[in-house]
Amino acid sequence: MEPYRLRVPGRIEELVRRLHPGLKRKVRAGLDLIRTDPTVGKELRDELAGLRSLRVGKLRIVYRVAAKRLIDLVAIGPRRTIYQETLRLLRRA
């Protein structure tokens, strides 16, 4: 089966580029896992319903399945702040 395509905003590309090499490998492995099986992440609730979150070390990758075979990355960050940051990004959009 063909993997899903990822739509990655420039701000997320830049964040991943600046990560420590070990963490960058983990994030890329997480993204590959999401591309293969988008249901792997935990479904989020309440104001973040429709999004999913995958734990990668101390970081979370927040994403949504946007269309047939397309995944939108929404945010990547530490658990402590990622959900508030995601809400802020969604309200601005």
Language-model features and meaning:
Residues 1, 39, 43, 77:
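Residue-level signal for pocket-adjacent positions within structured domains
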Residues 1-25:
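Arg/Lys-rich, positively charged N-terminal/basic patches that mediate binding to nucleic acids
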Residues 2-6, 59, 64-93:
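Enriched for short, Lys/Arg-rich terminal
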Residues 8, 44-47, 57, 78:
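A secondary-structure boundary/capping signal
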Residues 13, 45, 83:
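Nucleotide phosphate-binding site architecture
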Residues 21, 33-36, 88:
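Short, intrinsically disordered, mixed-charge
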Residues 29-54:
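A short, surface-exposed loop/turn module that caps and links secondary-structure elements
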